[in-house]
Amino acid sequence: GIIGCVMLVAGALLWQTKRIKEQKKFGYRLVRHLNFFTFLGLPFASAFYLMVNRIIPASFEPRELYEVSAFYIAWLLSLLISFSCSIRKGIIIMLYITAAVLFLIPVISVVLVPEASLLNSLKSVHWSLVGVDLALILLGLFYLVVLRFYQTKFITLGEAK
């Protein structure tokens, strides 16, 4: 699964890099924005979906509709970000907001469902809940590390446009 995703991203970036001389053409710019929309938008939309899942009460009847709608709205927001600013700024924005949403999910658990918070899950030995919250925190940290790497390696060298 994850290796397949890495292969997709690598292939798309290689295709994009190979055609960098064509960057003024509409097709190249469109593919660049669609790559942004796919590879940065999907993780953000997935994290947003999980956040909405934690916010909406389980007893709420049309819960699934709201969760799926939230996913697509977040994904479309990434497309809007892609087309409304430069790719460089868009990448920074998407990395920041994805990290923020990932960090917010465990915080929402503390506020809305205190018995399912990370500390209470540790005390009551609910390892599945602990694993999910820790994975979300680690993913949020990963996004911040990627953001820092992107800002220091690519922006300072002027390679990201």
Name these PLM-found stretches.
Residues 1-161:
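Conserved histidines in hydrophobic membrane contexts and catalytic metal-binding motifs
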